[in-house]
């Protein structure tokens, strides 16, 4: 008998960190919740990171996921922006890890491929497929939609991902 696994997908960002929670049982996906944690751009960096930490910690505490998936970040031409995004991503990985959850990472093209079938697609294609895969899904904005897509990617890949982690030691 299979158990339902609750997955939180996290799309890290310093201004807005999207989160999406799904339940998966076998091949079935069920929307649970989604949203965005924001930080105040007028505050210093440390305070903004605290806001992201506290917001994500509240979500993890309220929804009690079993596993987490975080999108890997890309390097852009602005080194300072890349560094800040990396710090927000660190918070996105730290919060579920501190709650005892296994945390997996996925490249953006792997997320798109899992949801829309190709590694390069538009946001509207992701939104459309989310509604097809989970008709009751509700999301406001790209960040929450991306987070749900990350959770779906993990649901599709979690068995192989666990095996690779076990083999890596």
From Swiss-Prot:
Known role: The RuvA-RuvB-RuvC complex processes Holliday junction (HJ) DNA during genetic recombination and DNA repair. Endonuclease that resolves HJ intermediates. Cleaves cruciform DNA by making single-stranded nicks across the HJ at symmetrical positions within the homologous arms, yielding a 5'-phosphate and a 3'-hydroxyl group; requires a central core of homology in the junction. The consensus cleavage sequence is 5'-(A/T)TT(C/G)-3'. Cleavage occurs on the 3'-side of the TT dinucleotide at the point of strand exchange.
Pfam families cross-referenced by the UniProt entry: RuvC
UniProt entry tagged with the keyword Hydrolase: yes
Top EC class of this enzyme: hydrolase
GO CC annotation, single: Holliday junction resolvase complex
Family statement: Belongs to the RuvC family.
Residues at which Mg(2+) 2 binds: 71
Entry cofactors: Mg(2+)
Tagged with keyword DNA repair: yes
Name of this protein: Crossover junction endodeoxyribonuclease RuvC
Record localization: Cytoplasm
PANTHER family, sorted: CROSSOVER JUNCTION ENDODEOXYRIBONUCLEASE RUVC
Organism domain of life: Bacteria
Main location: cytoplasm
Subunit structure: Homodimer which binds Holliday junction (HJ) DNA. The HJ becomes 2-fold symmetrical on binding to RuvC with unstacked arms; it has a different conformation from HJ DNA in complex with RuvA. In the full resolvosome a probable DNA-RuvA(4)-RuvB(12)-RuvC(2) complex forms which resolves the HJ.
SUPFAM superfamilies from the UniProt entry: Ribonuclease H-like (SSF53098)
Positions with a binding annotation for Mg(2+) 1: 11, 143
E.C. number(s) listed in UniProt: 3.1.21.10
GO biological process, one term: DNA recombination
List of catalytic residues: 11, 71, 143
Reactions listed under catalytic activity: Endonucleolytic cleavage at a junction such as a reciprocal single-stranded crossover between two homologous DNA duplexes (Holliday junction)
């Amino acid at each position: 008998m299979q158990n339902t696994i609750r997955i939180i997908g996290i799309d890290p960002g310093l201004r807005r960190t999207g989160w999406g929670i799904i339940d998966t049982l076998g091949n079935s996906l069920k929307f649970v919740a989604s949203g965005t944690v924001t930080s105040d751009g007028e505050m210093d960096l440390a305070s903004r990171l605290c806001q992201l930490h506290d917001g994500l910690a509240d979500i993890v505490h309220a929804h009690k996921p079993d596993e987490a998936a975080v999108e890997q970040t890309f390097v852009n031409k602005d080194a300072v922006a890349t560094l800040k995004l990396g710090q927000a991503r660190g918070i996105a990985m730290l919060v579920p890890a501190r709650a005892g959850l296994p945390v997996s990472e996925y490249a953006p093209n792997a997320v798109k491929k899992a949801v829309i079938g190709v590694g390069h697609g538009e946001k509207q294609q992701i939104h459309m497929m989310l509604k097809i895969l989970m008709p009751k899904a509700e999301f406001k904005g790209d960040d929450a939609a991306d987070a749900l897509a990350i959770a779906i990617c993990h649901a599709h890949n979690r068995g192989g991902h666990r095996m690779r982690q076990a083999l890596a030691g």
